[in-house]
Amino acid sequence: YGQVSFIPAYDTQYRRLALFFAAEDQDVVFKTDRLETNSQRRGSLSQPNEWLAAVSFQDMDNDGLSDIVLITACSYGDGGPLIHPEAPASAGSGIYKVGDVLFQKNGAFYRDYRLSNQLNRFGMNKSIRFITSFIRDGYSTEFLYTATTQKELLDNGFQIARDQYHSRQFEKLGRLYVVPGTYRMAEYTVFMVYLVNEEGYIVWSFQPMGDYENLYGLKGISCQDIDGDGLKDIMVFASYSYEGSSGQSVVESGYSVYYQRTAGFYEDTDMKQTIKCTDTDTMSGLVERARAYWGWKTGQ
């Protein structure tokens, strides 16, 4: 194309993003709205786009041509008023990120739908560097979600947090090892927790980070009965970071609770709306407050 102007444009009625490329004489030489961010609501013209969070032009497939890397901010909402772009794409903000790559070839740009699906499904859409690390450099977090054994995790670079690694007898699942750990990719530390049996097979996995972007520090993991049903539940307490509205790193404390049931575990979504945590909270204090939420007396 030579020298062109890159013009992103939003349809404010349907919240769809379109990209235009204009030559020096202002003629549009290429345009597209075939973007991952326009496919968040399958089969719907209306989409949850809020704003274009980041864009980069670089060669992603080593063919000597500049490709386009995009990150958009989308809302979990139902199509209400646009959220102000000062709102950070973080846990609890109602905003999540969508990454995409457009490869330049034969005078046009095209998307590899499989790559777009992978980078968003496995959380590699946090930053331009994260996407570049996956697309261009070949690193991936996919194994964190697809591994079947602890050995497979370790072989791919998963680092166990040894100070929180221990075994517990779970009433419905037997004796399992609680295996928390991290995987470093680009500038991000991805945090996961696994339950592994004595043969080394993964029985269950947890994603405590949720919509947070990076683990800042693991504060504790507790395996105790929280809801009073006689079954050990799991609480994870950590501090996480995300990119603020001005590009600065913001650190927040967060916790997750997973209740043991006959078929496995399910994550609490209600209690977290009532019990908020701060940097001054402790693991034991959170367990006490969580039990009180379920009607346990302090110290019971």
Residues covered by each model-derived region:
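Beta-propeller-forming repeat regions
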Residues: Y1-M60, L65-I226, L231-Q300
